[in-house]
Amino acid sequence: MNEKESNILRMQELIEELNKYSYSYYVLDNPIVADKEYDKRYDELVELEEKTGITYPYSPTNRVGDVILKQFQKYTHKSRLWSLDKAQSFEEIIDWHNRNKKAVAEYNSNHEDKLPELKYVLTKKFDGLTINCTYDESGVMIKAATRGTGVIGEDITSQAKTIKSIPLKIKNGSVVEVHGEAIMTKTAFNEYNKKAEVPLKNLRNGAAGALRNLNVRETARRNLSAFFYDVGYNEGKAFKSYMEMMNFIKEMGFPVDEYLKECNTIEEINKEIQYVGDIRSSLDYDIDGVVIVIDDYRTREYLGYTVKFPKWAIAYKFEAEEATTKLLDVEWNVGRSGRVSPTAILEPVELAGVIVKRATLNNMDDIGRKKVKIGSRVFVRRSNDVIPEIMGVTEETEGETNEIEAPTICPYCGSEIVKEGVHLFCENTLSCKPQMVKSIVHFASREAMNIEGFSEKTAEQLFEKLNIKSISDLYRITKEELMSLDKFKDKKASNLINAIEKSKKCDLASFVYSLGIPNVGKKTATDLCKQFKSFENIKKASYDELILVQDIGSIVAESIVEFFKQEKIEKSLNELFELGVTPFYEESEVVENAFTGKTVVATGTLQNYSRTAIKEKLESLGANVAGSVSKKTDYVIAGENAGSKYDKAVQLGVKILTEEEFEQLINNM
């Protein structure tokens, strides 16, 4: 073997290794090699490719995207990519199901080779760009194309190769076309927009715009992902069912979404649609519905197609989470930290089943980057049940528009506004009503000092009528003063005084949280207490000591240090302690058990625990409770309708416990 042959052999070894590493990292979310080791092999491959002048089409070096194309070429799909019929209501799903039942019954009454009972498979309907990847007899991806008309699409092979989860070579000996959806995750979207001169307006446009960009380097910058869900053209062994076909896709190394649900009844389908709708906002990518297909391929063949759609599939569409409307005005609001933030007043628009009239604009820098003006038509997005956000302006804005101007004085107290970084602040912390009211409400809230019977209306009256100017003033209020307020009689006043008095003896984590330290939530407050054991230790902790605490980074550490440096905070704390507030810390002794130090995920509906209760129970056992399943998860506790987290646990080989097994374990400790 000469040197060139030896180099080529080594290149093929490296390509196989690197593609295996990429599959484990990007598809299974289970890295099997350190980044440094991957980079070492990758650099060796680059060097050998330069030396030999050979680059194989399935080499990972093709994913860099270092090319600018002159134009898109047309590509004729080997098999048509069908659109799906769509249902906006569940009644339409029932009608579709009844048509299927009738057709199958008619066939079975006239044929001896009976069709099986109807079984459906449900998948998420991804909101991205459909792609069709073609692999030759050697298993090499030779083409990737958009759906286009369904018959003819556009060649996006170079762009698709930048999606690291798409295999460039599969172990298959026949020509096959595999259909998927290219998507942009919310994580990738947010990372891209941090640095983008012109921010992306939504995830779908982010994915579609990347794949239809002739500058492939720009495609690579957007860090797209993909899920695959269908085989179109296939010269290999025919599939008998959708589930068999999906197993083939998985075995070939394609990224497949963890949610894949088999249903036998219309009631099960309805339950699953509701489940996917419930988890929709918690996903890291956009979906706009659920796809329902018949599993059996013989039944599919018998039902056939309309001019536009297959009769054996339908898509249930969710309410839109994104819409366009007109920006009517901007209102400036003050938070408890003194930050003055813009809120958009919108022409009312329906979004995810809710009428939306207001949306966040973040800050003036964000307004400038998105080119938003009063009178503009804007994209509005709602997710995670939070206040909707304006993502950008549409191209069809008509009529007069006006620049949004930042205020120079506080809209509530008239004090001068100062700019710190990208944010505006009112520094009048003592007599600016929104700041004081919101600080008191936060201090008294259930997770903080837990003062029962305290409300925002009460806080407003305390500020306006009793001249309360700090949280310590709460502990100076008398019953007689409370009875001078609206709707306060003897009993209500007594109850609130007793609740305020009772709050003086509080656990340390609740007290730390009640102070409203920027970027410190209840979990961070709890972590601080576990680490430092006393309030005095937390207060005097240095930056270097703070960043050693689990989940505390530089921003949170700086916030804590700066907070305790302030003279007004020192004064307020001293007053609270003088008035009898005595936070205490009790270190709960955790007996070594099966869950100590383990990462646990609870999913589905549990019979004996609410979400909060199971979280508290696990934490009391010394477990770390996580919200998603990964290779670092030790246990998954699965209740009814466990769904995608259960599926991922099975895929990764994570130990799964039923609620009964969990209780048996803790009862035997």
Curated annotation (Swiss-Prot):
Which EC class is this protein assigned? ligase
Tell me one GO molecular function of this protein: metal ion binding
Which BP terms from GO are recorded? DNA repair; DNA replication
Q: Which CDD domains match?
A: BRCT_DNA_ligase_like (cd17748), LIGANc (cd00114)
Binding, Zn(2+): C410, C413, C426, C432
Q: Which reaction does it catalyse?
A: NAD(+) + (deoxyribonucleotide)n-3'-hydroxyl + 5'-phospho-(deoxyribonucleotide)m = (deoxyribonucleotide)n+m + AMP + beta-nicotinamide D-nucleotide
What EC number(s) are associated with this protein in UniProt? 6.5.1.2
Which residues are annotated as active site?
A: K125
One cellular component term from this protein's GO annotations in UniProt:
cytosol
| Matching SUPFAM superfamilies | BRCT domain, DNA ligase/mRNA capping enzyme, catalytic domain, Nucleic acid-binding proteins, RuvA domain 2-like
Family, per the entry?
Belongs to the NAD-dependent DNA ligase family. LigA subfamily.
Report the protein's function.
DNA ligase that catalyzes the formation of phosphodiester linkages between 5'-phosphoryl and 3'-hydroxyl groups in double-stranded DNA using NAD as a coenzyme and as the energy source for the reaction. It is essential for DNA replication and repair of damaged DNA.
Name the record gives this protein: DNA ligase 2
The scientific name of the source species is Clostridium acetobutylicum (strain ATCC 824 / DSM 792 / JCM 1419 / IAM 19013 / LMG 5710 / NBRC 13948 / NRRL B-527 / VKM B-1787 / 2291 / W)
Q: Which gene encodes it?
A: ligA2
